[in-house]
Amino acid sequence: MAEVAAGVGRFKSNYAVERKIEPFYKGGKVQLDQTGQHLFCVCGTRVNILDVASGAVLRSLEQEDQEDITAFDLSPDDKVLVTASRALLLAQWAWQEGSVTRLWKAIHTAPVATMAFDPTSTLLATGGCDGAVRVWDVVRCYGTHHFRGSPGVVHLVAFHPDPARLLLFSSAADTSIRVWSLQERSCLAVLTAHYSAVTSLTFSADGHTMLSSGRDKICVIWDLRSLQATRTVPVFESVEAAVLLPEEPAPELGVKSAGLHFLTAGDQGALRVWEAASGRCVHAQQRLRGPGRELTHCTLAHAAGLLLSVTADHNLLLYDARSLRLRKQFAGYSEEVLDVRFLGPEDSHVVVASNSPCLKVFDLQTSACQILHGHTDIVLALDVFRKGRLFASCAKDQSIRVWRMNKSGEVACVAQGSGHTHSVGTICCSRLKETFLVTGSQDCTVKLWPLPEALLSKGTGHEGGPVFLQAQATQHCHDKDINSVAVAPNDKLLATGSQDRTAKLWALPRCQLLGTFSGHRRGLWCVQFSPMDQVLATASADGTIKLWALQDFSCLKTFEGHDASVLKVAFVSRGTQLLSSGSDGLLKLWTIKNNECVRTLDAHEDKVWGLHCSRLDDRALTGASDSRVVLWKDVTEAEQAEEQAKREEQVVKQQELDNLLHEKRYLRALGLAISLDRPHTVLTVIQAIRRDPESCEKLETTVLQLRRDQKEALLRFCVTWNTNSRHCHEAQAVLGVLLRHEAPDELLTYDGVRASLEGLLPYTERHFQRLSRMLQAATFLDFLWHNMKLPALPTAPAAL
């Protein structure tokens, strides 16, 4: 524990992204492979391939044109994937390698809306927004058929399951189903029974029966031998997909007799099983209230025994096909993330509130996702109790809910409460014990909700349903929306922050006003108590963070640095630093003592609404309007250890370099200096070589024995030396060796040689001119010396 405390108390200097939870499905088609191990789905310009077991994105396929994907299909043999983009290009992929094997024009005059393979994985049919249907041979790489006659967008194509019959079915805006013969290259029949768009076509195993579904709330059974409708089944909902079930008993689905049964998915948000002969619904899932629950897609993987359904809010649900037991849940797109929290005693899970009534709980180890239903409108805020298993949520539906995660990681609602008259925008849990909740609302009031002891003593999942909470105290606190509430570490104080530009301090449990913090120029988004000192932090839309003293309500410090609203603030490093997030998508780390912004982190592209720190203070979690949830890891100690190791390595190498120079082992000394990537050190070695009596030969021998990458580095260093007249001689000496012994063609293949030559030429010319002038001056001095010699003095006469 002492080590943990010491680690928490150190100043942090940097965070690094540990992992991201990003959107992988934004609507459109989804498809399982035959084994049920891979899931293919569209996300804008990419087709993402998910590993069903782990939930991780294995590969993202994006066409060269980088346009939105409008349609795709996987061949029945799971070998070929074809995608169509808005640029009217078709791409054939070897998806397991992630490579494009063929790219060709769709020849449609408008984007491709749908496509489907035939059972042999040889033919591909494409339906376009131009009303045309085309058939392609993907093995021989040519177009085989072009069918016209469909009015409007062709949004559905399907091949007959018997490849010998060579029949293609399509449906367009006229609500009819057209049957095309590939042999006769003509339309055999137009099947009319629907009065609204046909949404799916599926075939029986023997190929004699076809089921069609539509938004006209009916499903039609067709006899493909006579091409006539044999039965119309009213299903009382707009159907987006229908699936024929295998003709075998499935008691858990209500299939107890032989005969044709099918499953529908539609706007009621529940899967239902129907008996075709009687038109009865023999099994139905429980319906869930709230928007976004409508089912938009459903597909069956027969070999894997899996059924996949997709909801309107982009959640993917994987069921056991024989029992409809839920196996997996995937959150494809979270839209705008409004709040995030670590969950579990060891912060092993993450709970996310997005622009949806559903909560999403992710296991950080396995990436498994749970989707929690309960609220009927958008969830706005979250908070977690001290032990980590119990957490609370509040929403626009004016209610709050309490959830508990059991030891196996399953989460269930254990309590709910209502009483506010407007959206509940903020919630905070008690800090010492799991005893109460505090909520703030757009009705300008704060409510205190005690948790009954019976709730705390019971396990997860009450047989009688969630416990109903009653508010113990209600207080009108501000004149505008309350954006944030915070409970002090001792559970005796409450802070509120509002759009009225003030924060207020209250005494619990009676909510008595103690004082007001005034000073911000715009509304407050967040208030937080320091875990160590009697200090309150406030974050405002004016782009500042302020620290306030609880004793006299004075402003102690103001932190400026965000260019936009500061949305969240949290204390880290035992209250000595702050972590803040803003609407500019940035995360900032501050040291309180000197008002310094230590680090600015950028991993989001929009407003960062959610910010939470782990129990050990070594990780942080952020969620933003760009649909991303980012997990950050404190890398301060790792970076410090890395820097220390680098310094020690530099000292050792410097000592080794000095020893090599002393021993006149120039080749190894030069190689070591180059590996250090220090031009001045390399210059020192070159100067030592040139001081040797046999400098020319030794320099030439040493340079020529270097590897090519070392010569490239040496050439770059020469550019730096050549800019200084004191070091240009060493640069020119090295350059002379290279030019004399390396062929021009070889030199031109060096990495960065052109940039090096551009840097060498002007300074070399300048040095040449300077030396030429010096040579002229020296020659002139020599000339003057020879011409200014004094004549010989006359010899003195001999003495008489």
Swiss-Prot record:
Keywords: Acetylation, Isopeptide bond, Nucleus, Phosphoprotein, Repeat, Ubl conjugation, WD repeat. PROSITE patterns: WD_REPEATS_1, WD_REPEATS_2, WD_REPEATS_REGION. The modification N-acetylalanine is found at A2. There is a cross-link at K407 (Glycyl lysine isopeptide (Lys-Gly) (interchain with G-Cter in SUMO2)). The modification Phosphoserine is found at S257. InterPro entries: G-protein_beta_WD-40_rep, Utp13_C, WD40/YVTN_repeat-like_dom_sf, WD40_repeat_CS, WD40_repeat_dom_sf, WD40_rpt. Its main location: nucleus. GO terms for molecular function: U3 snoRNA binding. It comes from the Eukaryota. It is found in: Nucleus, Nucleolus. One of its GO terms (cellular component) is 90S preribosome. GO terms for biological process: endonucleolytic cleavage in 5'-ETS of tricistronic rRNA transcript (SSU-rRNA, 5.8S rRNA, LSU-rRNA); endonucleolytic cleavage to generate mature 5'-end of SSU-rRNA from (SSU-rRNA, 5.8S rRNA, LSU-rRNA); ribosomal small subunit biogenesis. WD repeats lie at residues 64-105, 107-146, 149-190, 193-232, 245-284, 290-329, 332-372, 374-413, 419-459, 477-516, 519-560, 562-602, 604-642. Part of the small subunit (SSU) processome, first precursor of the small eukaryotic ribosomal subunit. During the assembly of the SSU processome in the nucleolus, many ribosome biogenesis factors, an RNA chaperone and ribosomal proteins associate with the nascent pre-rRNA and work in concert to generate RNA folding, modifications, rearrangements and cleavage as well as targeted degradation of pre-ribosomal RNA by the RNA exosome. Part of the small subunit (SSU) processome, composed of more than 70 proteins and the RNA chaperone small nucleolar RNA (snoRNA) U3. This is Transducin beta-like protein 3. The gene is TBL3.
